[in-house]
Structure formats: C-alpha cells, structure tokens
C-alpha cells in the first residue's frame, strides 16, 4: 500500500482536515516535475546518474556493526519559538554526507520562527524553476503550522481534563476510605499518593505553555528526571520534590513571560488543597444518568445534585463512572500520540520525495526544525499516558497490569472465518429456499386453489412480518458496509462501546438466519397442508409463525452473554426511550431508532394481527373477525401513529431543552404525517364515506410528503445547497461520484410517494391486495435504508467540521466551585 493511502486510513476521521494535506503537497511536487521535464528533455540521464550513485554507495567498505561513534558536531543553536522572530537554523547534511563519501552540500533553505508560525526561505529562488520550489515550501510551512497549532490546542484541552480527573480521583480515594474505614484512617500515609497525578499534570501543563523549541527541550529533560523520581506510592520526600519542581516550573513560565492558564489552575488547587478528608465536604453526587425522575426535576428546576451517601453500592457506581472516564481519556491521549507520529512521518516522506526530485538536501534541515518544534519535542502526552496507566492499574484493576492494560487498550476485534462461512452458507440456503418456494407454488398450483384468498388474508400477513424485518436488517448491513468504505465513524456516532459494534457480516448473519427460519416455516406449512398424512394436524401447521416470532422475541431479550448481547440491549434501550420519549433526554441513536419505526408501520400492524388472530380468532380454521372488530380498527390508528407520536414528543423535548426552532418545524412535520396516516387509515376502514376521506387523505398526504421530502434532502442530508462548490449538493462529499447523490434524491422522492397506492387504489390483476401492501411497505424500508446512509454521512461531516472525535463522559462528583475559590 502506498503511503498516501496508508496515511489516510490511519487518520482520525473527525480530524481529517487537521492533518497534513499529503496529496496537495504531492501535487505541488508534480508541478516541479512538469517544469523540469519541460526545461530538461534529458531527464532520464539524470535518473541514471542517481542509479550509478546508488551502486557506488553499495560498493563502499562496510563500516561494521560495532564501531566507535564519530565525534559529535556542535550544532548551531535552534532556540526561539512562536513568541518572536528567531532564526531556527541553516543546517547542512555534512555529517551524513561525510560518512557516505559525498561532498559537502549546504542546505538550500533557511527556517525562521515568527509570531504566527514557522517560515522557510528558499535560498535558490533565483535559479530556473525556483519559484515552484518556493511555493512548495510556503505550502509546506502552512501545513506544518496548521498541524502544530491544532496539536497544541488539543494538548491544552487534555491537560485541563487531566486537572478535572485529578480532582475526581481525590474525591474517589477519600470516598473509598470513608466507606472502607468509617471509624477513621491515617491520612498522612496517603497524602503523597493522592498528589502525584496533580504533580505530573502541573509539570505537563507548564510544558504546554513553553512554545519555544529550546524551552520544550529543557522541560522534556526536567520531565524525564521528574518521572524517574516519582514512584507509585512514593515517600513524602518524593512528594516534596514534586512540589518544588512545580514551583521551579512556575518561575520558568514567569521568566519567559508566558501565562500557563492550566498549570496555574493546578498550582492554585494544590496550594489551597485541604486535608484529603475535607475534600468530601466540598463535593456532591452528580446524577448524570437521565431518568424520568431527573426529567421531572429539571422541569421543576430542582437540582440533580445530592448529598454523599457512603455505601458500597454508591462506591461501585462512582468507580464505574471514573473507570469509563479514564478509559475515554486514555483513548484521547493515544489518538493525540498517533496524530503527532503520523504527521511527522508524512512530513518526512514528502521531504524525501522533494530531495529525490530536486537532488537537493533540504529534508534533514526541515526535519530538525520539526524535531525541535513543539510537535516533535513535547512529551506531555507521553507522560500523561504513563501516569494514567499507573493510576488506572493501581486504582481500577487491583494492581493487575495485564488486566488494566486490556481495559485501556482493548484488542481489535478479529473477523472470524466461521462468521464469513456461515453468512455465505445461509445466503445460499436462503436463495435455495426461495427457489423451492416458487417451485412448490408453481408445481402444486397453489394460487388457483380454493383456499388461496383465505391464505393470503390470514397467513400472508403473519409471514410478511419476517420479510419486513429481514429486509430492514439487510439494508442496515449494506449501510455498515458503505459507512466503513467511505470512513463514516458510525460506531462513534451511535455511541457503541469499542469492540462491541457489529460489522456488516454479523448483521447479515442475523438477517439471513431469520430469513432461512421464516422460509423453512413457510415451506413446512405448505407441505403439511398439502400432504394428506399431516393435514389433520391443523394446530401445529398454523402455529409455526407464532413459534418463530416467540423464538425471536426470546432471543432478543435473553440476558445471557450470547447472540450479541450488547447490541441487543442497546437496541432495547433505544426502543424503550422511544416509547417513553418525553421522559428521557433525546440522543441521536434514540431518534434514529424512532425514524426506523416510522418505516415499519406495516410490521407493527402485523404484530397487532398476530395478537388478534391467535388471541381471538379460530386460527385452526384460519377464521377471524379482526377486520370487523371496532377495537381492532381503533388499534389500527393507534399502532400506526405510535412511531410518529414518539418522534413528535422527542422533537418537543429537544425544542424545550435546546430552544432551537428547527425542532419545532421538525415536530410539525411529524404532526402532519400523523394526520395523513389517520386519514388514510380512516379511508381504508370506513366504506360509507370513502369519497370524502379519499380527498382529505390525498391532500394531507401530499402536504406531508412534500414537507418530509424537503426536510430529508435539506436538513437530514444537507443537500440542495445552491451556493455550494458542488452545485445543489454540499461542500463536502464522501462519495466521489456526484451522480450518486442525485440518484438518491430522485429515489427518495419516488419512494416517498409510494403512499399513492393506498389513496388511489392501484390494483393489478395478478397481485393480491395484501401483496400490494407488502410491496409498498418494502419500498418504504428500502427508502429508509438509503436515507440512513446519507443521514449519518451528514452527521459525520458535522463532527468533522467541529473536530468532534470524543464523547463527553459524565463525572461522578460535582465540586462546589465557590468553596474552591474561597480556599
């Protein structure tokens, strides 16, 4: 794999724009190549010269594996940073060149540090084609300054978060001791232990403010010495030296004229640190879990903070929250380390390409500047990683390093060959069963039998439920495949725990399994019905779909850790939040599940038919009076509007919390849909006034469909932007083929108006009415599958625009800030 593709594949998707634009810099190098080819038609000869030079270097005498290192050359000072205009260096490659037997070559660039970033001066701009190389270094500087600025901002953010975690750890240790030793405990033995994390955070925060390369290097040396002095559970002497080092860091910052906001907060916190037991007097429980009770409290404007209750149950909850916070924080640190490493590697690669193309020796000079910059020399993130690991292992994994590291660094989920094989096998079985079903219907002439209409009115709605479920699962599997292909971070958007998200193969496995079992039941039903020997067992024949539905429900709610338990519980949680919409804070997974339910209205009506057919009908003889029951017809309205009412309540909740008028318009969309669904249902039930209901249903359905289509394209997908650089689309597109978006918009419009069948009564002589209903419902599911892809693509691009790559993790304790300031 070429480096460019590997570089893109290793990026944090939400930070894509903050990385070095490798492809753009390559295009600048291609401009240099084009110019050289125009002005130097004997370019191949130049290439052979390099090959000859390469062969000559291979024929040099071997210098040995164990040799005395040459005397180090004293380099020029590289001091200076963003605070002033200093010359970073005019380096040369003399050391390496002498070793390789190459004549001394002076570097063609001069790098300066200004207040707004690093600037490179190309010293050979007067040469032919020098303007192209000048532009290249100008763009290179822009990319590096962008990368370093972003990295510095993110490091400052994690340092602030480290301060908060340190406070939480103080409270946790105090709370733990209070629970385990209610009669008192010698705190003096733990004072140093509790301040170690704060000491490192203070030193690291001070290093963030040191923007000069020289300052960063000096702090790096001090940090290494400090890390050697600190041991987990060290002596009071070690703690004292930590405080003294913090004071030294503060003096360095004052001398440099740099105000370290984060480190200042840490020093102030540590200077006014009360005795550890007094920490508990300043904190309360922060109830961040959304419940109906907390919702009612927020409406009544009551505080969600409660006094501390020292029990082992509360201790377990606090530890669980802090454990999750540390894991999330650790992932941030790892991504920051990866960001720094990948960008340094990318700059090294692009500079080597430049040297190869131009036969100059600029890479070493520029890379030395990078190594001495904040991006290359700061080690704050590395030190925090070490401290977080030590803290987590000691306090959250009982000093078991392997256990703690397995939690902090969960292993990547391996694709199992048996899943791939099973999915392919089930796909083949499904295809074979479909062929067998059509063959049985054809050979036994079932469509012309006397009970064909009765079968379609009773058994077909029962089995069509499984078809709707399987189709929706297959569409979701397709969504996952294309989300991964176009690097949509769906697991982050949905909030899946790392390692628990299902891949498209697992989802296909689930869908195909349900499809195979459903087809087996259908074939068994038809076979037993036709076979004279089993025709008498009417109860068993008719109960097959009920058995399958019951089995699916049991597997869905099974509490054991089998059949993808985390995914099943995630779905059930979102489903419950949809049913209790106004009482729970609306999250993206919750309203996405609600949107899926709006496309499964016919499946919900099939479940209603199950209850009526097996509860009050004579299922043995396929006789029921469901359509003649007033209660059943009333529930046709209720069941059909439940998903839309749920989404309407979610929109109202968000309107109340966020004060965003868009949520009000979104709620109006669902209200119009509720009216249209009720009118269409009334039209299909009330045969006495069908003409009036038909007109009303057509008018409101048209209004709702137009409103919903506009909302889909403009707000959910972010398309139809006339001023975009991609006309009528949006500025950022993940799918390179623009025609895909136009095709999707056309399909969404056509499939959105599939309701016309229910109003205009399209009938085909070869298709039963129940078959037509199933086809229309399937088209809506397909439309929803298409909608899902572009909806999450737009959400992902919104995260990219805000560089939002992490979830906010709620913390268990809430500090009284007034007390903090008072102390």
UniProtKB/Swiss-Prot annotation:
It comes from the Eukaryota. Belongs to the SYG1 (TC 2.A.94) family. Residues 1-368 form the SPX domain. Its main location: membrane. Residues 1-420, 481-505, 564-694, 761-823 are cytoplasmic. Residues 70-79 have a biased composition (Basic residues). GO terms for biological process: phosphate ion transport. Residues 627-823 form the EXS domain. The lineage of its organism: Eukaryota, Viridiplantae, Streptophyta, Embryophyta, Tracheophyta. It holds the Pfam family EXS. It is a multi-pass membrane protein. Induction: Not induced by Pi deficiency. GO terms for cellular component: endosome; Golgi apparatus; plasma membrane; trans-Golgi network. Residues 243-256 have a biased composition (Acidic residues). Residues 442-459, 527-542, 716-739 are extracellular. This is Phosphate transporter PHO1 homolog 5. It is found in: Cell membrane. Residues 69-94, 230-273 are annotated as: Disordered. Expressed in root tips, vascular cylinders of roots and filaments, leaf petioles, stem, receptacle, stigma apex and anther connective tissue. The chain crosses the membrane at residues 421-441, 460-480, 506-526, 543-563, 695-715, 740-760. May transport inorganic phosphate (Pi). Keywords: Cell membrane, Membrane, Phosphate transport, Transmembrane, Transmembrane helix, Transport.
């Amino acid at each position: 794999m070429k480096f460019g593709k590997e570089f893109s594949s290793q990026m944090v998707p939400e930070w894509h724009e903050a990385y070095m634009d490798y492809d753009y810099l390559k295009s600048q190098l291609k401009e240099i190549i084009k110019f050289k080819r125009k002005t130097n038609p004997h370019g191949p000869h130049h290439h052979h010269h390099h090959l000859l030079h390469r062969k000559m270097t291979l024929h040099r005498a071997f210098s040995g594996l164990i040799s005395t290192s040459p005397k180090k050359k004293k380099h020029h000072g590289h001091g200076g940073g963003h605070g002033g205009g200093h010359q970073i260096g005019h380096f040369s490659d003399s050391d390496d060149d002498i070793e390789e037997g190459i004549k001394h070559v002076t570097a063609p660039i001069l790098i300066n540090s200004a207040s707004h970033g690093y600037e490179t001066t190309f010293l050979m701009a007067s040469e032919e084609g020098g303007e192209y190389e000048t532009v290249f270094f100008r763009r290179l500087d822009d990319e590096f300054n962008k990368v370093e600025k972003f990295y510095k901002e993110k490091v400052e953010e994690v340092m602030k978060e480290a301060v908060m975690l340190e406070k939480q750890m103080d409270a946790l240790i105090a709370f733990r001791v209070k629970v385990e030793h209610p009669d008192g405990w010698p705190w003096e033995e733990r004072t140093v232990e509790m301040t170690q994390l704060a000491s490192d955070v203070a030193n690291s925060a001070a290093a963030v403010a040191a923007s000069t390369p020289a300052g960063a290097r000096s702090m790096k040396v001090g940090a290494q010495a400090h890390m050697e002095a600190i041991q987990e559970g060290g002596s009071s002497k070690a703690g004292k030296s930590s405080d003294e080092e913090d004071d030294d860091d503060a003096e360095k910052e004052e001398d440099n004229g740099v105000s370290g906001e984060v480190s200042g907060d840490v020093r102030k916190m540590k200077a006014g640190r009360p005795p550890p037991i007094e920490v508990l007097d300043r904190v309360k429980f922060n109830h961040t879990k959304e419940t109906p009770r907390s919702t009612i409290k927020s409406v009544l404007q009551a505080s969600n903070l409660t006094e501390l209750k020292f029990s082992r149950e509360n201790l377990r909850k606090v530890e669980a929250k802090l454990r999750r916070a540390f894991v999330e924080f650790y992932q941030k640190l790892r991504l920051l380390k990866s960001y720094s490493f990948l960008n340094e590697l990318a700059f090294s690669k692009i500079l080597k390409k430049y040297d190869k193309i131009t036969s100059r020796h600029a890479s070493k000079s520029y890379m030395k500047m990078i190594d001495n910059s904040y991006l290359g020399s700061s080690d704050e993130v590395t030190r925090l990683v070490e401290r977080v690991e030590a803290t987590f292992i000691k306090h959250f994994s009982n000093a078991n390093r392997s256990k703690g590291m397995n939690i902090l660094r969960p292993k990547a989920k391996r694709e199992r060959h048996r899943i791939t094989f099973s999915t392919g096998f089930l796909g083949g079985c499904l295809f074979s069963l479909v062929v067998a079903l059509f063959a049985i219907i054809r050979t036994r002439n079932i469509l012309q039998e006397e009970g064909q209409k009765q079968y379609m009115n009773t058994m077909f709605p029962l089995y069509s439920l499984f078809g709707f479920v399987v189709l929706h699962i297959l569409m979701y599997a397709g969504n996952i495949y294309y989300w991964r292909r176009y690097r949509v971070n769906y697991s982050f958007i949905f909030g899946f725990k790392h390692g628990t998200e299902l891949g498209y193969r697992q989802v296909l496995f689930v869908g195909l399994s349900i499809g195979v079992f459903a087809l087996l039941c259908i074939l068994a039903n038809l076979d037993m019905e036709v076979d004279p020997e089993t025709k008498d067992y009417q109860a068993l024949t008719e109960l097959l779909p009920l058995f399958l539905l019951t089995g699916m429900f049991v597997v869905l709610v099974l509490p054991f850790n089998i059949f993808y338990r985390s995914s099943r519980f995630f779905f059930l949680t979102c489903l419950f939040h949809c049913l209790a919409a106004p009482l729970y804070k609306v999250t993206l997974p919750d309203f996405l599940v609600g949107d899926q339910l709006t496309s499964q209205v016919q499946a919900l009506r099939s479940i209603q038919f199950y209850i009526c057919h097996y509860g009050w009908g004579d299922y043995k003889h396929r006789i029921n009076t469901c359509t003649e029951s007033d209660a059943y017809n009333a529930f046709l309205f209720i069941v059909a509007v439940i998903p839309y009412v749920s989404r309407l309540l979610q929109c109202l909740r968000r309107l109340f919390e966020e004060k965003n008028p868009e949520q009000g318009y979104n709620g109006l969309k669902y209200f119009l849909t509720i009216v249209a669904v009720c009118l269409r249902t009334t039209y299909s039930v009330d045969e006495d006034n069908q003409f009036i209901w038909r007109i009303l249903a057509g008018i409101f359905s048209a209004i709702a469909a137009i409103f919903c289509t506009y909302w889909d394209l403009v707000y959910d997908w972010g398309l139809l932007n006339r001023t975009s650089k991609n006309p009528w689309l949006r500025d950022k597109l993940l799918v390179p083929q623009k025609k895909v978006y136009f095709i999707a918009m056309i399909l969404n419009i056509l499939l959105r108006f599939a309701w016309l069948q229910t109003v205009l009564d399209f009938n085909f002589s070869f298709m039963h009415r129940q078959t037509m209903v199933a086809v229309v419902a399937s088209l809506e599911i397909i439309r929803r599958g298409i909608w899902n892809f572009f909806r999450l693509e737009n959400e992902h691009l919104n995260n990219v625009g805000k560089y939002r790559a992490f979830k906010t993790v709620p913390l268990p304790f809430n500090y009284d800030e007034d007390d903090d300031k008072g102390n």
